[in-house]
C-alpha cells in the first residue's frame, strides 16, 4: 500500500526512508557513467559547432533581418549557452558523480540547464505564434513582422525564463555521499515538498501551456492550408515540415522529461519499493539527454525555416552546386500557384 510522506511523521523514520531511497538510486551510478557521458558528448560534438556556425550565419550573412531571424538567433544563442555546460556534466558523470568544481558551479550548471531548456521552449512558442499570425491572419502580419516585436518577444522570453528558474538556485544542493561530492539535480535535492509544488507550477506554466499553444497553432495552420488555395504549393510542404519538426521536438524531447520528472519527485514522497523507485529513476535518467536533443531539432529548424539560411550556409562552406539546387527549388516554389 502506498503511503504519502507529506503528512507529519516521525522525523527519524523519514530520514531513514530518504537514506534508503538514496541507497536505491546509488545503484544507477554505473548506468549513468556508461550512458550520460556518451550521449552528452555526442550532443556537444554536434551541437556546439553547429550552433556556432548558425549564429555566425545569422549575424554576418542574413540580411535583412526579419522577426523569424531574430527569434532563431536567440534560440541558437540559448542552445550554445546550454552546450557550454555539457563538458562539466560529462566529467561529473564519467567520474562516478564526483563534483570537483565547487558549490557555486554546481548551482550555476544546473540552473543553466533549466534556464536554457525553458528559454528554448518559449522561443519555439514565440516562433509558432508568429507563424500562426502570418498564415492565419495575414492582414495583421505586416505589423507583427516588424523586427521590434520580435526583439520585445525575445527580451520577454529571457526575463520570464530567468524568473521561472531562479528558485532553483535555492532548491538545488550539493552534498557529500560515500566519500564523493555530489551535485544533485532538482529531483534529488532535499526540500521535497517545496520542490514538488515548484515543479508542478514550473511544468504547467513553462511547458504545458507552451505545448498547448504550439499544438493548436500548427494544427490550425495545417487545417487552413489543407482547405486553402495553396494546397499543392511548396508553401504547404514547408508548413508541414515545420509542423512535424516542432511537434517532434515538443513531444519526443520535452514531454518525456517533464512527465518523468514529476513521477520521479512523487516517487520520493511516496513509500514505494526500492525496485520501483530504481526503475523510475532509471527512466528519468534516460529522459534527461532527450531534452537536450532538441538542439539537434533546432539545427534542422534553422534550415527548414528559411531558404536564405540554406543559401548563406552554402555560401559559407562554398557548396555552389547545392546552392544552385536550392535556388532552383526556390524558383520552382515561387512559380507555383
From Swiss-Prot:
Which residues does the entry place in the Extracellular compartment?
1-37, 91-116, 173-200, 264-284
Sites of glycosylation?
A: 23
Query: Which ranges sit in the Cytoplasmic compartment?
Result: 59-69, 138-151, 222-242, 306-337
Q: Which Gene3D superfamilies match?
A: Rhodopsin 7-helix transmembrane proteins (1.20.1070.10)
Per UniProt, which keywords does this protein have?
Cell membrane, Disulfide bond, G-protein coupled receptor, Glycoprotein, Immunity, Innate immunity, Membrane, Receptor, Transducer, Transmembrane, Transmembrane helix
The cross-references to Pfam families, in alphabetical order and at most eight, read: 7tm_1 (PF00001)
Tell me where in or outside the cell this protein is found: Cell membrane
Q: List the disulfide bonds.
A: 106-183
A GO BP entry is: G protein-coupled receptor signaling pathway
Q: Which GO terms describe its cellular component?
A: plasma membrane
Give TM segment ranges.
38-58, 70-90, 117-137, 152-172, 201-221, 243-263, 285-305
According to UniProt, the tissues expressing it are described as:
Highly expressed in mast cells and is found predominantly in the tissues of the respiratory tract and kidneys.
Q: What is its main location?
A: membrane
SUPFAM superfamilies referenced in this protein's UniProt entry, alphabetically: Family A G protein-coupled receptor-like
Instruction: Tell me a Gene Ontology molecular-function term this record carries.
Output: G protein-coupled receptor activity
Superkingdom classification of source: Eukaryota
Task: Look up and give the membrane topology term.
Answer: Multi-pass membrane protein
* InterPro entries linked to this entry: GPCR_Rhodpsn, GPCR_Rhodpsn_7TM
Functional summary from the UniProt entry: G protein-coupled receptor for dicarboxylates and amino dicarboxylates. Receptor for itaconate, a metabolite produced by myeloid lineages. In the respiratory epithelium, couples the binding of itaconate to the activation of GNA11 and downstream intracellular Ca(2+) release, leading to mucocilliary clearance of airborne pathogens. Receptor for leukotriene E4 (LTE4) produced by mast cells upon allergic inflammation. Binds with high affinity to LTE4 and elicits mucin release from pulmonary epithelium in response to airborne fungi allergens. Regulates mucin-producing goblet cell homeostasis.
* Protein family membership: Belongs to the G-protein coupled receptor 1 family.
Q: What is this protein called?
A: 2-oxoglutarate receptor 1
State the organism of origin: Rattus norvegicus
The UniProt gene name for this protein comes to: Oxgr1
Amino acid at each position: 500500500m502506498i503511503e504519502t510522506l507529506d503528512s507529519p511523521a516521525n522525523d527519524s523514520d523519514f530520514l531513514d526512508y530518504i537514506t534508503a531511497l538514496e541507497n536505491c538510486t546509488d545503484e544507477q551510478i554505473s548506468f549513468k557513467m556508461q550512458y550520460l557521458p556518451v550521449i552528452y558528448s555526442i550532443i556537444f560534438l554536434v551541437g556546439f559547432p553547429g550552433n556556432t556556425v548558425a549564429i555566425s550565419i545569422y549575424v554576418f550573412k542574413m540580411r535583412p533581418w526579419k522577426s523569424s531571424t531574430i527569434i532563431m538567433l536567440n534560440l541558437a544563442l540559448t542552445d550554445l549557452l546550454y552546450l557550454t555546460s555539457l563538458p562539466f556534466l560529462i566529467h561529473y558523470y564519467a567520474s562516478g558523480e564526483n563534483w570537483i568544481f565547487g558549490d557555486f558551479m554546481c548551482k550555476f550548471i544546473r540552473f543553466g540547464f533549466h534556464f536554457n531548456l525553458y528559454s528554448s521552449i518559449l522561443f519555439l512558442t514565440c516562433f509558432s505564434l508568429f507563424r500562426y499570425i502570418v498564415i492565419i491572419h495575414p492582414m495583421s502580419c505586416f505589423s507583427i513582422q516588424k523586427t521590434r516585436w520580435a526583439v520585445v518577444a525575445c527580451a520577454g522570453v529571457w526575463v520570464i525564463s530567468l524568473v521561472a528558474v531562479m528558485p532553483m538556485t535555492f532548491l538545488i544542493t550539493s552534498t557529500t555521499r560515500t566519500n564523493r561530492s555530489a551535485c544533485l539535480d532538482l529531483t534529488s535535492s532535499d526540500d521535497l515538498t517545496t520542490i514538488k509544488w515548484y515543479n508542478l507550477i514550473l511544468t504547467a506554466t513553462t511547458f504545458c501551456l507552451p505545448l498547448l499553444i504550439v499544438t493548436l497553432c500548427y494544427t490550425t495552420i495545417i487545417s487552413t492550408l489543407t482547405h486553402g488555395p495553396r494546397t499543392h504549393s511548396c508553401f504547404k510542404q514547408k508548413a508541414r515540415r515545420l509542423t512535424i519538426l516542432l511537434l517532434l521536438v515538443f513531444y519526443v524531447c520535452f514531454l518525456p522529461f517533464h512527465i518523468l520528472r514529476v513521477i520521479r519527485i512523487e516517487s520520493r514522497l511516496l513509500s514505494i519499493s526500492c525496485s520501483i523507485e530504481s526503475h523510475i529513476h532509471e527512466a528519468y535518467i534516460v529522459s534527461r539527454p532527450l531534452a537536450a536533443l532538441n538542439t539537434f531539432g533546432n539545427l534542422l529548424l534553422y534550415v527548414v525555416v528559411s531558404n536564405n539560411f540554406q543559401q548563406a550556409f552554402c555560401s559559407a562552406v562554398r557548396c555552389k552546386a547545392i546552392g544552385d539546387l536550392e535556388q532552383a527549388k526556390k524558383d520552382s516554389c515561387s512559380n507555383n500557384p
